[in-house]
Amino acid sequence: MRRGIIVLLSLSVVAAAAVFTADKWAIRHESIVFNDSTRGKRPVAVDFAVRRDKEMQADAGMLKLPVAILNHGNTVRFTEYSFLANVFAARGYLAISIQNDIPSDGPMVTKVGELYVGRLPQYQRAITNIKFAIEQMKEIKPSADYSKLTMVGHSNGGDIAMYFAKQYPDEIKNVVTLDNLRVPFVTDGRFKILSFRSHDPHFKPDPGVVPDEDECEKAGIIVVNTNFQHNDMRDTGPEEAKGSIQAMLDKFLADADSSAIAPVDTTNAAATILEPGPIPLRTLMEKVKREADIRRSGRAELSRTN
């Protein structure tokens, strides 16, 4: 039986944790804007992070990259969770951060008494964005495994991640939330869940969102109670908060993943970019050329619509 646990995150426990930085030789980030023609060419911006050595091996057909989808909080940009994306990338994931709202969407409002306090339309729109972005990323990164996703999100993004998991449980590998407040956890034990909770009096989860200790035990859910504020859980947060979350997340991935991929040392990766073994250079160059063509056509379409 998978065991759940409620943890009080201690800074002293993770003081020696590795720092996950986007060293230019180890992890790279790239931002792209896709336009959804079925929704009036709605722009859907994504930023993906990937380990360079694993990307090259995947492009050469040597492996498939697991995929993590990161969802931002309300009013926060999709690029403000690189501290999380880098942990996934260091573990060999293709980490895709998606911008789920645009200025023309208007502000998100709270409607007490309605399901998810009236935010269901935002969740549904986000799911459409995620599905669309995945289809576009398949063209750019076909060497990733999009059949089983790790859904990640902070605050409203955590609710989006949990709602997606409720709607598409067969497509989920893991769920990681940071202080989601509205959508109750999935408790049927079909996939692993890790949730970081803030110690913030201004951000309290709705009743029934976070399971009690017995339910966590039965469902294999890990709840990490921290002393951090709600808004500490993003790139602008204090280093001790981000470092602690990174360390616990990395441990969760190490325990949850069946692969032998270990995090790269992003401060000394230049000499060990590739693992031993031949790489078909022609195949790799064809992949690179095709990706460049796709990006150029996407940028040309974006310039025509602006």
Functional labels for PLM-detected ranges:
Residues 4, 12-57, 263:
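An N-terminal hydrophobic leader/cap segment in hydrolases
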Residues 33-144:
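Serine-hydrolase catalytic machinery in alpha/beta-hydrolase-like enzymes
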Residues 64-67, 91-94, 146-148, 170-174, ...:
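Loop/turn elements at helix/coil->beta-strand transitions in domains of secreted/extracellular proteins
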Residues 134-189:
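Primarily recognizes the serine-hydrolase "nucleophile elbow" in alpha/beta-hydrolase
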Residues 219-298:
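C-terminal catalytic histidine-bearing segment of alpha/beta-hydrolase fold enzymes
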